[in-house]
Amino acid sequence: GNISTALGIALASKQTFAVLGDLSFLHDLTGLIHREEINCSFIVINNDGGGIFSTLPQRGVDGFESVFGTPHSLDPAAIAKAMGISATTISSVDELKKTLKAPVKGISIVVANVPSRDENADSLKAIYESMNSI
């Protein structure tokens, strides 16, 4: 999974940041069970489900939320803490910048709470459209 891959990459580095979505984090939790002396900070983008799927044409059709959105209402930081892993939650760009400037010591989880999946998808669409017009 994504967590195990990031940890493997981090073995060859002094410190690593890995970015993944909340669903990827939840699916790959077992990768955090056997920890080595690895310096890897996971930035978990938490939009309560599969945000990437909200960019697809099926967004808004009947059944979309249960099949693609898959909201979970879980707290990734609380789950990480229950596993004995350092975890914090951020909700601003300034907090993210501060996190990225700090040294990475061991394995940690930084949960970045972001706008709703729909707002996020609309923002991505606007970015893609502006890039296509260049």
What label would you give each PLM region?
Residues G1-I134:
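Thiamine diphosphate
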